[in-house]
Design a protein with these regions (language model features):
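Catalytic Walker B motif of ABC-type/P-loop ATPase nucleotide-binding domains
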Residues: 184-188
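Conserved catalytic motifs of ABC-family nucleotide-binding domains
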Residues: 180
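Helical segment within the ABC ATPase nucleotide-binding domain
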Residues: 199-212
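Conserved ABC ATPase "signature" region
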Residues: 109, 128, 132-155
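Conserved ABC ATPase signature
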Residues: 159-163
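ABC ATPase "signature
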Residues: 244-245
């Protein structure tokens, strides 16, 4: 049974100045797949990310939500090691990213619709190329299993540039799972896909969270999708986490008719939400 949580997270600067990762109860004795503690990223004196703390547990799918400019992409880029935090700590499967970058990132992978694979290579060539980069053992068997999981075996020898958007997304997800990551980051993975294809991919991603020993951090602007897929959501605005909880319960807790209405309120009136949390 999926855990349901409806707690609110106080933004930094309030009574609880950022919830420490150690304060977050673990689902089991193992460390969370992602632990972010008081993370800050500053550009020119402005905090794009302002002291956020959260965790992603095993088998959990967490939605990172917020309007454009809220700090979502900056947060993901810090977790991926693309950006260096101004302050704070990131641990992936218990490994501190700053202290042991290679070992931490070896447990991670990423997929997004805006990051397609080289179109001049076939599906098989792409998966072999990235599999070698990731030093995947028994690579051919791993590729065969992922081609079957995402129903793309018939495209094995097709160049990725000739595939449809949905087919390319399936290949990107297969690539992201080659190294069996403990932490999978998905940035708008079903954007621009037709409803049937998006539904099938959501089901496949949900199965990954259930069947593996990892967790998933998912960003999306599709609130229907988030409500259907995510166990927990974090609402980010102006670099701060304003709300956290079960996406099916949060709207009623804050007098909103839907998750979409609550999203709009957070985007337009973050100070009002912040005051309500007080």
């Amino acid at each position: 049974m999926r855990e349901r949580r409806g707690t609110l997270r106080a933004p930094p600067g309030l009574a609880r100045k950022g919830l420490a990762v150690n304060d977050i109860p673990a689902a089991d004795a193992a460390p969370p797949v992602l632990a972010v503690e008081r993370l800050v990223k500053t550009y020119g004196g402005t905090n794009a990310v302002d002291g956020i703390s959260f965790a992603v547990r095993r088998h959990e799918l967490v939605g990172l939500l917020g309007p454009n400019g809220a700090g979502k992409t900056t947060t993901i880029n810090m977790v991926l090691g693309v950006l260096e935090p101004t302050a704070g700590a990131i641990a992936i499967d218990g490994v501190d990213l700053a202290r042991d970058r290679a070992r931490a990132l070896a447990r991670t992978n990423f997929a997004a619709v805006y990051a397609p694979l080289p179109g001049n290579l076939t599906v098989l060539q792409n998966l072999r190329f990235f599999g070698r980069i990731y030093s995947v053992e028994r690579l051919e068997a791993r590729i065969d299993a992922l081609l079957e999981r995402f129903d793309i075996g018939r495209f094995r020898h097709t160049k990725c540039g000739l595939l449809s958007s949905g087919e390319q997304t399936r290949v990107c997800l297969a690539k992201a799972l080659l190294n069996e990551p403990t932490l999978l980051l998905l940035d708008e993975p079903t954007a621009s896909l037709d409803p049937a294809t998006a539904r099938d991919l959501r089901e496949a991603i949900r199965a990954v969270a259930r069947e593996t020993n990892g967790g998933i951090l998912w960003t999306s602007h599709n609130m229907y999708e988030v409500e259907e897929v995510c166990d927990r959501v974090l609402f980010l605005s102006q670099g701060r986490i304003l709300l956290e909880g079960d996406p099916r319960e949060l709207p009623a807790q804050h007098g909103a008719a839907s998750l979409e209405e609550l999203f709009i309120r957070v985007a337009r009136e973050p100070l009002g939400i912040e005051g309500a949390v007080r």
